[in-house]
Design a protein with these regions (language model features):
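Transmembrane alpha-helices and adjacent helix-loop boundaries
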Residues: 1-306
Length: 307
């Protein structure tokens, strides 16, 4: 029991600090801090499994985080039809060129035992594939980025609900982790740290500079979100009635109808921000709880005991 007392004390202190922020500053700020803590908890769980239990140094967490952000765009944003018509075919051809390159490289690795033939074959596939990709991708990318560059200039996504992007982000991060594991897990600790850091920087650099994919460092306008917008809540009658009922004592003390209406409007504005943040808190907390349960199950499984 004693080993848990420090953990309970630490969480209790943090909870008290967040409550103090809400009491003396703003509940909106307090919930923002709590939401950032929950997001950080998700990344911390992953780092704890890798580094804490398995002893595998990973400095590439930002690469996986960047893929999560990319997944939001690729899954939830509506497709940009003009961009697809301008250069979408070139991008699809490039995708299949990459697939053929991977298949050919696997073929050379599996069926060519002689080192010289295998090396020259793989080198030919890589160099030829890069040249084909360059010739095919460049005109397509230029055409896509020229489509209304102030607002779009990228292919868009699948137009699905934004919660699906959380699942998509997990699959993208898992795919990158599989590739990193195949390449770098045999390295010594310090080399593994350097390799993971470099791979993360490569991922971040690609996302930043390939504007046709997700607009790079530019903003993507109109991203969907799993919670209602504050402005919609402020005009919803059910929400106004709820806020009015919650603050009925304070409002009853105001005699002037105009002042009472102004006070109610301010209460509605403040409450809408808190309500939206509470929605995100519920979603983030659900994810953290599910991950804690899954990771605990994994930790006490044969795979976890081996770590």
């Amino acid at each position: 029991m004693r080993k848990y007392s420090n953990i309970i004390a630490a969480y209790s202190i943090m909870l008290v600090l967040i409550l103090l922020v809400g009491i003396f500053q703003s509940w909106s700020i307090a919930l923002t801090i709590l939401n950032y803590c929950l997001i950080s908890a998700v990344m911390t769980i992953g780092a704890n499994i890798q580094w804490g239990y398995a002893g595998l140094i990973n400095f590439g967490i930002m690469g996986y985080t960047a893929l999560g952000g990319l997944a939001v765009v690729l899954v939830s944003v509506d497709p940009v039809q003009q961009a697809w018509q301008a250069g979408g075919l070139n991008i699809l051809i490039c995708f299949w060129i990459i697939v053929v390159m991977v298949v050919l490289i696997r073929y050379f690795l599996k069926y060519f035992n002689k080192y010289t033939y295998r090396t020259y074959g793989i080198a030919f596939v890589i160099i030829g594939g890069i040249l084909l990709l360059r010739l095919t991708a460049t005109p397509g990318i230029e055409a896509i980025e020229a489509v209304d560059p102030a607002k779009t200039g990228f292919l868009g996504g699948m137009g699905l609900p934004v919660l699906f992007s959380w699942i998509g982000g997990a699959f993208l991060a898992g795919g990158l982790a599989f590739i990193v594991g195949k390449i770098a897990l045999g390295l010594r600790a310090d080399y593994l740290a350097i390799a993971t850091l470099l791979i993360a920087e490569i991922v971040v650099s690609i996302i930043k500079h390939e504007e046709w994919l997700a607009r790079g460092v530019k903003n993507v306008i109109g991203l969907k979100r799993p919670a209602p917008y504050e402005i919609d809540l402020q005009t919803s009658q059910w929400f106004i009635n709820l806020v009015e009922k919650f603050h009925s004592k304070k409002l009853s003390m105001i005699n002037s109808i105009t002042e009472r209406q102004d006070a109610l409007s301010q209460f509605v504005i403040d409450a809408s921000s808190v309500y939206v943040k509470l929605c995100f808190t519920g979603l983030f907390l659900s994810v953290v709880i599910v991950l804690l349960i899954v990771t605990q199950k994994a930790l006490y499984s044969p795979w976890g005991r081996k770590m």
